[in-house]
């Protein structure tokens, strides 16, 4: 099963189980959780079921394409269901069956691993899912998002698409993954991975990035004052990515790191609160629609 087929199979599987199949969000981010389809929709009482592919950038993870299992740019397949279905583990195992992985034929373990995103003020309890000794998925029951208690609790399922594809195709490097039957992952991304690593670790200008962070933070604050939820979130995400680039460049001390994370978390909290207030003013329309449908 090539990489495209893995995505198509998961899209069909979760669509058949009531999920909106959304698209990735068009700004740099370190995780699929940062997409407003998850970060914002996990807040408040309204039900929400969504699935989507999210390209992620984690500058510090880059290894110039030389590490077979580690890139600074990669893909997550994200599922969020609110409220969490009682049979969510069974649904997940069925999704593996749809990919041709029979759980009864493999060593599948749910290993306790609570998750946290300090910059988003988000955390939850959950597990890593290990398939024959390799982590392929993260399960998280959200307790907070934007430092706001999640009621009801959402379940987030994050598949590592590259790891899944490597397992299914029995290859030992990301670059060897068949994206289609005649194009590899390396054909598509290896050169870009090398160049982005050169930028992240060598060519980026720390002064420029520090200035960018300050400008993005200033813009986020004035947008929050104007009560513009999504534009505000855009600039919070830009702050986060600028910080990650500075971190990769090695120019932020331990003390500064904590302070920068706190500044981003404070902005994320304000955006989350603003979103909740906005939905409340609208009388939580999706909650009403669900009650009428029932």
Swiss-Prot record:
<keyword id="KW-0648">Protein biosynthesis</keyword>
<dbReference type="GO" id="GO:0005829">
    <property type="term" value="C:cytosol"/>
</dbReference>
<dbReference type="Pfam" id="PF02091">
    <property type="entry name" value="tRNA-synt_2e"/>
</dbReference>
<dbReference type="GO" id="GO:0006426">
    <property type="term" value="P:glycyl-tRNA aminoacylation"/>
</dbReference>
<keyword id="KW-0067">ATP-binding</keyword>
<dbReference type="GO" id="GO:0005524">
    <property type="term" value="F:ATP binding"/>
</dbReference>
<keyword id="KW-0963">Cytoplasm</keyword>
<dbReference type="InterPro" id="IPR006194">
    <property type="entry name" value="Gly-tRNA-synth_heterodimer"/>
</dbReference>
<keyword id="KW-0547">Nucleotide-binding</keyword>
<comment type="subunit">
    <text>Tetramer of two alpha and two beta subunits.</text>
</comment>
<dbReference type="GO" id="GO:0004820">
    <property type="term" value="F:glycine-tRNA ligase activity"/>
</dbReference>
<protein>
    <recommendedName>
        <fullName>Glycine--tRNA ligase alpha subunit</fullName>
        <ecNumber>6.1.1.14</ecNumber>
    </recommendedName>
</protein>
<dbReference type="InterPro" id="IPR045864">
    <property type="entry name" value="aa-tRNA-synth_II/BPL/LPL"/>
</dbReference>
<keyword id="KW-0030">Aminoacyl-tRNA synthetase</keyword>
<comment type="similarity">
    <text>Belongs to the class-II aminoacyl-tRNA synthetase family.</text>
</comment>
<dbReference type="InterPro" id="IPR002310">
    <property type="entry name" value="Gly-tRNA_ligase_asu"/>
</dbReference>
<keyword id="KW-0436">Ligase</keyword>
């Amino acid at each position: 099963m090539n990489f495209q087929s893995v995505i198509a199979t998961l899209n069909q599987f979760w669509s058949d189980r009531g999920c909106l199949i959304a698209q990735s969000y068009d700004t740099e981010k370190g995780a699929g959780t940062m997409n407003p389809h998850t970060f914002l929709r996990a807040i408040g009482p309204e039900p929400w079921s969504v699935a989507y592919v999210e390209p992620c950038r984690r500058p510090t993870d880059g290894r110039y394409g030389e590490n077979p299992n580690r890139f600074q740019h990669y893909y997550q397949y994200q599922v969020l269901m609110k409220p969490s279905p009682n049979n969510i583990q069974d649904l997940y195992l069925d999704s593996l069956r749809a990919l041709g992985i029979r759980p009864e034929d493999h060593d599948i373990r749910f290993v306790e691993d609570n998750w946290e995103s300090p910059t988003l003020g988000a955390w939850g309890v959950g597990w890593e899912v290990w398939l024959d000794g390799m982590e392929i998925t993260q399960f998280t029951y959200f307790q907070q998002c934007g430092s706001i208690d999640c009621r009801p609790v959402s379940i987030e399922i994050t598949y590592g698409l590259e790891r899944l594809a490597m397992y299914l195709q029995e290859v030992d490097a990301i670059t060897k993954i068949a994206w289609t039957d005649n194009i590899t992952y390396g054909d598509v991304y290896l050169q870009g991975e090398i160049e982005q690593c050169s930028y992240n670790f060598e060519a980026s200008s720390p002064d420029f990035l520090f200035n960018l962070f300050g400008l993005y933070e200033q813009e986020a604050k004035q947008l929050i004052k104007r009560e513009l939820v999504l534009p505000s979130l855009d600039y919070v995400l830009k702050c986060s990515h600028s910080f990650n680039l500075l971190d990769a460049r090695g120019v932020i001390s331990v003390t500064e790191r904590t302070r920068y994370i706190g500044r981003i978390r404070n902005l994320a909290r304000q955006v989350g609160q603003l979103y909740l207030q906005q939905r409340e003013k609208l009388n939580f329309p999706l909650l009403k629609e669900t009650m009428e449908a029932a």
